[in-house]
């Protein structure tokens, strides 16, 4: 198989890159270790609302992925899902062969790594017997908000995920208890204000400074969560239907460590002007890329995608792009607006 660009990672930034490359008449293959496109957006929080996508006051993660796939579809990107890139070999004539764990080989002129946080898994709290409850009444992500209708939920954690899901699930849950080791939450001031309002209204209860201590129940069904005060060691039992621990993700760059690319703090170091890595014709964009002043935002990843694609075009064709706005260029198969 041959193409212009191999994109490693089928998250929102990777999918958008197929569109951006297509606008420059470059073909793409996209490889991802997950069994469906969307990255964390579909794997961990498909119903989570996103508020900072231009033109959308609010859009769910799943809907964003669907829209991005529709946007890129005229350019017919080829997806290789449930596959992990093991090796990127240099060929003669300034090209690569990208090889996956199941033997798929794709020859290309450039590679864009849009692998997000790499291979990830949620951090599991050290609670005895927790495996019995996982995927039954203990979950590390929210796939369907309706599953929590009129339920009592314990949410553990003090970051954005814990705070954001507390706000969202408070719309359907009977009661939410938020367990955190500290009084301060690592979330936006606006979200913190919402938490305080929800607590005043009795929709949630902030249980601080406490940590998870023990689970009670049987046959995979939780009946209570026991928490312990950090200072006094006092224990408190909270009746609950579900526990949602949000303690972040464990990153594993896996084979990326062996690709001969400069890394820093488990990220790929890039030139912020071009998104080039230390290896010629290999680029990195989105959360996996690091440079001074980096903002880990989806919209920033979209901009990085455009910058990388324009530089790749210049490298491949040995000349800069003859720039055209999308309104002038149009998209094959799509009618221009009158």
Curated annotation (Swiss-Prot):
The cross-references to PANTHER family, in alphabetical order and at most eight, read: THIOREDOXIN REDUCTASE 1-RELATED-RELATED
Keyword entries, A-Z: FAD, Flavoprotein, NADP, Oxidoreductase
Q: How does it assemble?
A: Homodimer.
Q: Which organism is it from?
A: Wolbachia pipientis wMel
The record's top EC class is oxidoreductase
Q: Which metal ions or organic cofactors does this protein require, according to UniProt?
A: FAD
Q: What is this protein called?
A: Ferredoxin--NADP reductase
Q: What is its EC number?
A: 1.18.1.2
InterPro entries referenced in this protein's UniProt entry, alphabetically: FAD/NAD-bd_sf, FAD/NAD-binding_dom, Fd--NADP_Rdtase_type_2, Ferredoxin-NADP_redctase_2
Q: Which GO terms describe its molecular function?
A: ferredoxin-NADP+ reductase activity; flavin adenine dinucleotide binding; NADP binding
Reactions listed under catalytic activity:
2 reduced [2Fe-2S]-[ferredoxin] + NADP(+) + H(+) = 2 oxidized [2Fe-2S]-[ferredoxin] + NADPH
Residues noted as binding FAD in the record, renumbered to the chain: 32, 40, 45, 85, 120, 287, 327
Similarity-based family = Belongs to the ferredoxin--NADP reductase type 2 family.
**So which domain of life are we looking at?**
Bacteria
**A family per Pfam:** Pyr_redox_2
Q: How is the cofactor bound?
A: Binds 1 FAD per subunit.
